Structure formats: structure tokens, C-alpha cells
């Protein structure tokens, strides 16, 4: 039993060293690795989608989202209803400089990724989170739409270590 526990601690330590040493490098896209200048007009159209406050940016019937809390939403309305149910509204979204990347493929499909500092307002107070936001876009009949979005919570090293220890205890 003691030997198994020592093995788990060595494993956790090795994983933490690995993630701790690569976490900052992995957050910023490598310079020059991806084509981030092709289709300049499409880039402008896709970036403008983020400024729309209505559902016209979404291909509503085909939109799927995974929230940072781990819930899957099928359609923009389902996602909006979750915000209303939990009394949460976006207060601010601030991209972390140098983390945004937008890749466009064949002028018809695009994928974006960025780290965002997000503040939600709620009746219980403001909720501050840092997320890695990824989105997929498609172009239909000359217009870009968001069809998939996912927010993944960025954990501190202590939070990551705690969740790893908790996961190891389940085994």
C-alpha cells in the first residue's frame, strides 16, 4: 500500500514538473507556425461576429457549445437559457495579449483560439474566470457563422495539482 502511494506521489510530481515547465510556453501560439494572414476580408468578418449582441452570428440550429463548467448546450437558445437560469451575464471579456489565433481553411471553415479574462455579473457578485476559448466557424451563402464554441477553465498550478491528487485518490 505504501509503495503504491509513493508511486502515485512520484507520478504526480513528474506530471507537475512537466506541466509547470511547459505551461507558459504552451499558452502562446508559436510565431510563424500558422498562416494567420490569408483571407484578410474573411478575417475581418469573423472578428466582427464577436461584437454582435444578437443571435445572427450563430448558425442556431447547428450551434453546439461546451461551457467552462463542462455543460454541453445544443443551440444558442439553450446556452442563453442556462445564463438566465443561473442569473449570469457577461460583464467583460478581455483577450490576453498574444494568445489569439485565427486560422481559415479554404475560405469556408475557420478555427479561433484565445485566452480570455472573463467577468460575469450575477446576483451573488462578479465571477472572474480565465478561459481558453475555441470556436469553429463556417461560411454559408457568403456569410460567416459560429457553429461551435468551447471555453476551458485555465487552472493555476495549485488547482491543477489539487485536481490531479483528487483524480489519483479515486483509483
Residue ranges and their predicted role:
Residues 21, 25-58, 164-171:
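Short, low-complexity N-terminal intrinsically disordered segments enriched in polar/charged residues
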Residues 2-12:
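Bacterial N-terminal signal peptides that target proteins for export
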Residues 102-110, 124-125, 137-143:
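A short, structured loop/turn motif at beta-sheet edges
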Residues 95-98, 113-115, 128-134:
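Short, surface-exposed coil-to-beta transition loops
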Residues 10-23:
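Bacterial N-terminal signal peptides
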Residues 130-158:
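Short beta-strand edge/turn micro-motifs at domain boundaries
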